[in-house]
Amino acid sequence: MRHKEQSEGPSVRVLRVGEQVRHVLSEILARGDVHDDVLATHPVSVTEVRMSPDLRHATVFVKPLLGKDEEAVLKAMRTNTAYLQREVAHRIRMKYAAKLKFLADDSFDEASHIDRLLRDPKVARDLEGGDEGDQG
């Protein structure tokens, strides 16, 4: 029997379940079903959910839409973890209820940092000079 190599990445099933969990959490937060003052005043985007291969653990990446009070939003999400886990378990039929872990999504910050670097005049000059050297 062949063993799955580590480099293959998540299976289609793991990706599908992660997307279902993301959709359910987004719906709960959009409706305001969580009775929390911080979450009521800060719209939150669930950007990605990464499931473990056994589907028992989910890492949920969240980002406040206005980009403010990220730590307060994360604390509120973590405070309401039990409620959110229960709701996900009720709405998605799985053998085990996934344990949710909330983390801040820094991908937007990293993308804007890279964009700023690429727009830097020194970098633009180097990129333009590199293109001319490749043509000869």
Swiss-Prot record:
Q: Does the keyword Cytoplasm apply?
A: yes
Recorded GO MF terms: ribosomal small subunit binding
Q: Which residues form the signal peptide?
A: none
What's a GO biological-process term for it? Answer: maturation of SSU-rRNA
Question: Superkingdom, according to UniProt?
Answer: Bacteria
Read off the InterPro entries from this record: KH_dom-like_a/b, RbfA, RbfA_dom_sf
What the entry lists under Pfam families is as follows: RBFA (PF02033)
Q: Which residues cross the membrane?
A: none
Q: Which UniProt keywords apply?
A: Cytoplasm, Ribosome biogenesis
Chief location: cytoplasm
Give the location in the cell: Cytoplasm
Q: Would you tell me the Gene Ontology cellular component terms?
A: cytosol
The answer on whether this UniProt entry bears the keyword Membrane reads no
Q: Which family does it belong to?
A: Belongs to the RbfA family.
Question: What is known about what this protein does?
Answer: One of several proteins that assist in the late maturation steps of the functional core of the 30S ribosomal subunit. Associates with free 30S ribosomal subunits (but not with 30S subunits that are part of 70S ribosomes or polysomes). Required for efficient processing of 16S rRNA. May interact with the 5'-terminal helix region of 16S rRNA.
Q: Which HAMAP family match?
A: RbfA
Q: How does it assemble?
A: Monomer. Binds 30S ribosomal subunits, but not 50S ribosomal subunits or 70S ribosomes.
State the PANTHER family in the record: RIBOSOME-BINDING FACTOR A, CHLOROPLASTIC-RELATED
UniProt protein name? Ribosome-binding factor A
Organism encoding this protein: Sphingopyxis alaskensis (strain DSM 13593 / LMG 18877 / RB2256) (Sphingomonas alaskensis)
